[in-house]
Amino acid sequence: MKLFAQGATLDLTHPHVMGILNVTPDSFSDGGAHNTLIEAVKHANLMVNAGATIIDVGGESTRPGAAEVSVEEELDRVIPVLEAIAQRFEVRISVDTSKPEVIREAARAGAHIINDVRSLSEPGALEAAAETGLPVSLMHMQGNPKTMQEAPKYDDVFAEVNRYFIEQIARCEKAGIAKEKLLLDPGFGFGKNLSHNYTLLARLGEFHHFNLPLLVGMSRKTMVGQLLNVGPSDRLNGSLACAVIAAMQGAQIIRVHDVKETVEAMRVVEATLSAKGNKRYE
């Protein structure tokens, strides 16, 4: 399985680590740490040297309770960073956005992947993504970032996320986005309680019936902190456990804050799966 974008190829026969680069003042874990161009490029360099093959640049926090930012502000935060990374590093670039204007400008700046927590539901986003021809990560979220964690409820969380993927794939194909351009993200922590999150993690491998890449992000999230009763800065161990469990089930892209540690964990996963004949655990 491979992804093609902007003349580049991403081989998905092994797990890739996607390093998180939040250029925001209010992200839940690292808000404000990298929201200048110099600091953002410096952190991107650290992640690339640590083994990240994808850098995910986001200019709007999607933490629970987060407020939206204007198009102009998000463009000002994201585009200079995307351009700088594209010019300096041999790495795939993902843009974490829901806005059509940012999608178009990010594609021009050198982005390879659109990572949209709202699955192209904002007006004009679907059309913008289709125009760029870039791969798109479709994420499941119940509600919106401002209210999603107030009282998430499902009759069957796996069935509902699965149904959502079916609907979104069909919607994208109708708009002219080829199925092979899509990635699927169950949306850990987005409108889900502890039980919902671990049910999805336990059954993650079942989503391979779509024959599409799986992107997962559990790094430093509440599903780790609540279980272990620790704050964001003390969630590395739990985050690594989640990453390994996901990769052993065949998740191709692991989105994380702690790149070096996750890259090393993925080497262990790869060695184990190789010894098993490259068959994932289900």
Question: Where is each model-derived feature located?
Answer:
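Short acidic capping loops at alpha-helix termini that bridge into adjacent secondary structure
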Residues: A178-K181
